[in-house]
Amino acid sequence: MARITVQDAVEKVGNIFDLILVAARRARQMQIGGKETLITKNNNDKYTVLALREIEEDLITKK
């Protein structure tokens, strides 16, 4: 199971509500297949975890 803290991601986006919107939008993009993940996918990482990791690594922004 992936353990991830969202505190770093919240600091990158601004607040928890915007983080939820940005991460959900990015997870949907990856799930539908329109956009590939920008980081290396681990074994059983779900799209929401991948989206949060991308936000933490500054690969995805609020805009």
From Swiss-Prot:
Reaction it catalyzes: RNA(n) + a ribonucleoside 5'-triphosphate = RNA(n+1) + diphosphate
Protein name per its UniProtKB record: DNA-directed RNA polymerase subunit omega
Cross-referenced NCBIfam families: rpoZ
Cellular component, GO annotation: DNA-directed RNA polymerase complex
One annotated GO biological process: DNA-templated transcription
Organism: Blochmanniella pennsylvanica (strain BPEN)
Family: Belongs to the RNA polymerase subunit omega family.
SUPFAM superfamilies membership: RPB6/omega subunit-like
GO terms of molecular function: DNA binding; DNA-directed RNA polymerase activity
Entry EC number(s): 2.7.7.6
